[in-house]
From Swiss-Prot:
Functional summary from the UniProt entry: Negatively regulates long-term potentiation and modulates adult synaptic plasticity.
A Pfam cross-reference name: PANTS-like
Protein name: Synaptic plasticity regulator PANTS
Family: Belongs to the UPF0545 family.
Organism classification: Eukaryota, Metazoa, Chordata, Craniata, Vertebrata
Length: 106
């Protein structure tokens, strides 16, 4: 049975490696350049992979905190992205009426 008090990284170390390989792939680099106008920053994935591997060897608290901080920063970055448009709470009041081709769109 696994020890419940033993800390594990939020991801398996191989997941960090896979993310880094995906980030460096030609297809992903092209997609990021097309979408954002620049190549993706992939070094954080490799740094996290190396930190995770080092943590597996030494079980150092500094490495543990570095991995936790990296994941926290990554999650905060995802949550700060705002949607393209505001979500509405209710449908428009006249949603059920047939469309009028002569009516100008808003």
């Amino acid at each position: 049975m696994a020890d419940s008090g033993c800390w594990r990284p939020p991801r398996d170390c191989d997941d960090y490696w896979s993310e880094w390989k995906h980030c460096k792939s030609l297809r992903n680099r092209f997609h990021n350049y097309y979408t954002y106008g620049k190549a993706p920053e992939c070094q954080e994935w490799k740094r996290d992979y190396m930190t995770c591997r080092d943590w597996e060897k030494t079980k150092s608290n500094n490495l543990k905190e570095a991995l936790q901080q990296s994941e926290k920063t990554r999650l905060e970055g995802k949550q700060n992205n705002s949607p393209v448009w505001t979500l509405r709470k209710n449908p428009p009041p006249d949603w059920y009426l047939p469309l009028d081709p002569g009516k100008p769109r808003q």
